[in-house]
């Protein structure tokens, strides 16, 4: 039962109990949680840094990008074949997202985000966030409203991602975003 739950990426527990005729009976329960997943959609230096830092932190990393050079750069740290995005408007199921997953959009050109965010918001992903300013985030949410995404789903979207605002270098932004994700998974 526990093994099947882990294969299905569900939290499971195992209990061990001593014989009932012994005093005192010894029992111990262990809870096992699937490894966290970090699913990244983006391009550029922040995308690359986030993949590397996510993997170094122990996350299973998945990547989607319109840039083949970015996918090639992060391929060594991925846990699955990267997905080459062909069009900003193409919808795709994000089947790899579950309750133990975080999904981030890491684009400076935000045209790629709406279809991806709509798909992500239809999943049980624990954390969904996007790069950008507060103004960009408000525009992003308005775009999702125009796409008829329910307000309850839109409220799940985090942005701008990161615990430290207004960072400029890719590695610092990645660390700041990952810290926010870690904090969410610890709650």
Language model: regions and residue ranges:
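Segments forming oxygen-rich coordination pockets for charged ligands
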Residues: 1-84, 98-101, 180-185
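Short phosphate-binding/catalytic loops that engage adenosine nucleotides
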Residues: 59, 125, 149
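Residue-level detector of alpha-helix initiation sites
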Residues: 44-45, 110-111, 135
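Adenosine-phosphate binding glycine-rich loop
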Residues: 131-187
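Short amphipathic alpha-helix with an adjacent loop that forms part of the alpha/beta core around
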Residues: 88-99
